[in-house]
């Protein structure tokens, strides 16, 4: 996994991959789009959105 821009379905797919059965919370106010789509995010940053 390389730090990258993840938007739309690619972001959701990456969250499923990282979080697995734990699932994740997706709320626009959490900043995941700002962090991973507008900017570049890492695997570690994605894990912050797992349940």
UniProtKB/Swiss-Prot annotation:
Which is an annotated Pfam family here? Insulin
One GO BP on record is: glucose homeostasis
Q: Which GO terms describe its molecular function?
A: hormone activity; insulin receptor binding
Q: Where in the cell is it found?
A: Secreted
Which Gene Ontology cellular component annotation is one that this UniProt entry carries? extracellular space
Database matches in InterPro entries: Insulin, Insulin-like, Insulin-like_sf, Insulin_CS, Insulin_family
Annotated keywords: Carbohydrate metabolism, Disulfide bond, Glucose metabolism, Hormone, Secreted
Disulfide bonding pattern of the chain: 7-37, 19-50, 36-41
Q: Does the keyword Nucleus apply?
A: no
SMART domains of this UniProt entry?
IlGF
Recorded family membership: Belongs to the insulin family.
Purpose: Insulin decreases blood glucose concentration. It increases cell permeability to monosaccharides, amino acids and fatty acids. It accelerates glycolysis, the pentose phosphate cycle, and glycogen synthesis in liver.
Q: How does it assemble?
A: Heterodimer of a B chain and an A chain linked by two disulfide bonds.
Q: What is this protein called?
A: Insulin
């Amino acid at each position: 996994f390389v730090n990258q821009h993840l938007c739309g379905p690619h972001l959701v797919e990456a969250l499923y991959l990282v979080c697995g059965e734990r699932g994740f919370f997706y709320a626009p106010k959490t900043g995941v789009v700002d962090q991973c789509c507008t900017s570049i995010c890492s695997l570690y940053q994605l894990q912050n959105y797992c349940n």
